[in-house]
């Protein structure tokens, strides 16, 4: 006879299952954020312009 795992029905089992689901969702959200950082920066307008680098360059007083 095969033993089949029973679903978690206790409060402790339900809390553990909920914590795992929340953790997986958070990890998935983080992975999506990391994977699409270049796209998000472009959409938000946060990309660095090459011409702005000259303005911010340090020039010593001579």
From Swiss-Prot:
Keywords: Chloroplast, Membrane, Plastid, Plastid outer membrane, Transmembrane, Transmembrane helix
Residue ranges, Cytoplasmic side: 41-62
Membrane spanning stretches: 18-40
This protein's GO CC annotations: chloroplast outer membrane
Main location, first listed in the record: plastid
UniProt subcellular location: Plastid, Chloroplast outer membrane
Cysteine pairs bridged by disulfides in the record: none
Topology term for the membrane: Single-pass membrane protein
Domain of life according to the entry: Eukaryota
Protein name: 6.7 kDa chloroplast outer envelope membrane protein
Source organism (scientific name): Spinacia oleracea
Phylogenetic lineage: Eukaryota, Viridiplantae, Streptophyta, Embryophyta, Tracheophyta
């Amino acid at each position: 006879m095969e033993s089949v795992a029973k679903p978690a029905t206790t409060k402790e089992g339900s809390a553990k299952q909920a914590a795992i689901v929340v953790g997986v969702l958070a990890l998935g959200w983080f992975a999506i954020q990391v994977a699409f950082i270049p796209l998000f920066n472009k959409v938000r307008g946060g990309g660095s312009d090459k011409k702005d680098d000259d303005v911010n360059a340090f020039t010593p007083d001579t």
